[in-house]
């Protein structure tokens, strides 16, 4: 976990600075989505992005590690997308003719429990990091439709100039049956 990066890479100060930088990036991303600044959000995604959210199943005790989540490339998932498909989703929403987003939802992203699991080549000179976080996304539609999405994300971020780009995001939604009428939220 975060201690492993600190010990392996030689210093709490470097880890703390890296973690703060990553948190700032994730919080900025959440703000862009909440403010519907989708074009700027898309700029945070790498061209080779993999954006994946498996479907979860209820399984017998002891089988959850192997069978609870669908596997990418096998079966179905809520999302198995790249930057191009996310760009098309954004374009569709911005037409104003998207039935599930007209009028636009009010969204609030909360990101917490950020942990830098790995930094390559080191915390001091990180070019790529693996980050785990928790999220809560509140969605309000029309007058009285409200939905909560809760779960965890594992992101791989790549250094790009003075910031980061998301190259992989795996989203684990902590529900096996979608409670919302549609899934137009970006996580």
Predicted segments with their positions:
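Short, low-complexity N-terminal intrinsically disordered segments enriched in polar/charged residues
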Residues: 2-47, 59
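Short solvent-exposed loop/turn micro-motifs enriched in small/polar/acidic residues
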Residues: 24, 107-109, 149-150
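Charged, gly/pro-rich active-site loop segments
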Residues: 110, 126-127, 138-140, 153
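Short hydrophobic/aromatic patches at helix-to-coil boundaries
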Residues: 184-187
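Short beta-strand edge/turn micro-motifs at domain boundaries
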Residues: 2, 124-132, 149-182
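A solvent-exposed, acidic/Ser-Thr-rich amphipathic alpha-helical stretch
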Residues: 47-119, 125-131
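Short, cysteine-centered beta-strand-loop-beta hairpins and adjacent loop/turn segments enriched
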Residues: 137-147
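Short beta-strand segments enriched in hydrophobic/aromatic residues
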Residues: 45, 135-137, 170
């Amino acid at each position: 976990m975060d201690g492993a990066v600190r010990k392996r890479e030689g210093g709490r100060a470097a880890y703390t600075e890296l973690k703060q930088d990553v948190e700032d990036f994730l919080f900025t991303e959440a703000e862009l989505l909440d403010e519907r600044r989708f074009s700027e959000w898309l700029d945070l995604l790498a061209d080779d992005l993999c954006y994946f959210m498996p479907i979860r199943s209820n399984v017998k005790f002891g089988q959850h590690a192997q069978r609870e989540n669908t596997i990418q490339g096998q079966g179905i998932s809520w999302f198995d997308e790249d930057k191009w498909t996310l760009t098309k989703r954004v374009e569709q929403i911005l037409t104003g003719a998207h039935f599930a987003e007209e009028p636009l939802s009010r969204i609030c992203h909360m990101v917490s429990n950020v942990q830098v699991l790995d930094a390559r080549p080191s915390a001091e000179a990180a070019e790529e990091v693996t980050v785990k976080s928790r999220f809560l996304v509140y969605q309000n539609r029309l007058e009285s439709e409200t939905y909560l999405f809760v779960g965890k994300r594992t992101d791989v971020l790549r250094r790009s100039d003075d910031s980061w780009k998301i190259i992989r995001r795996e989203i684990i939604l902590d529900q096996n049956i979608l409670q919302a009428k549609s899934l137009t939220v970006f996580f």
